[in-house]
Design a protein with these regions (language model features):
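Glycine/threonine-rich flexible loop motifs
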Residues: 2-6, 26-29
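Acidic, Mg2+-coordinating active-site environments of NTP-dependent enzymes
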Residues: 12, 16-102, 115, 119-134, ...
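Nucleotide phosphate-binding/pyrophosphate-handling subdomain across enzymes
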Residues: 3-16, 20-21, 34, 98-186
């Protein structure tokens, strides 16, 4: 956000913003709109923006910032676009747009949007740097996309919805705010 150390870097190629919740309220504000206003400080003219679905009051703040900065490469993740959500063998599977049968080891319905945010953020980066990364060929571009999907499939976040034992069932999660507790409940 506005106070984030990453602002010292300048204009990022891509900005990805996940679900806004009540966290760090002493610094960011007491309402979702106040917190969102602080978070929009990371959005700069010329960046690509990927935004997870948000509460209506948060979306109002983000939409105003997008207009103010003239952001043209903006993707809002619609949870209704996430298809074929299943769980088997300790993994979650899903499809999104052209991506079929994606898998991940991270558990929880919130992780679908997080994984898609990573995919769309990578796509936005690739759009800016295709020649540099892919050498301009479709085959290389597809190879890079496969690599991103493989990275998501292999990602583990210790202490987040982590099943330590099935018998007896023992799940560990470091939820520390209302969004985290809600995700754990779901």
């Amino acid at each position: 956000g506005r106070l984030d150390a990453t602002n010292a870097v300048g204009v990022p190629d891509v900005t990805v913003i996940t679900k806004i919740g009540y966290d760090h309220m002493a610094v960011l504000g007491n309402t979702l709109a106040e917190i969102a206003a602080e978070k929009t400080g990371i959005i700069k003219k010329g960046t690509s923006l990927v935004l997870e679905s948000q509460e209506a009051e948060v979306m109002t703040v983000f939409e105003a910032k997008v207009r103010e900065e003239g952001i043209t490469d903006f993707r809002l993740i619609d949870p209704l676009e996430i298809k074929e959500q299943t769980y088997r063998d300790g993994r979650q599977y899903f499809s999104f747009g052209a991506y079929r049968d994606l898998s991940m080891r991270m558990l929880g319905v919130h992780q679908y949007e997080n994984a898609i945010a990573a995919l769309l953020g990578a796509e936005a980066f690739f759009r800016r740097h295709t020649e540099w990364i892919c050498g301009g060929t479709k085959e290389r571009e597809e190879g890079v996309r496969r690599a991103v999907c493989q990275g998501i499939a292999k990602t583990v976040w210790k202490g987040r919805m982590e099943i330590l034992s099935k018998k007896p069932f023992l799940l560990v999660d470091g939820a520390h705010n209302s969004n985290g507790v809600e995700a754990l409940r779901e």
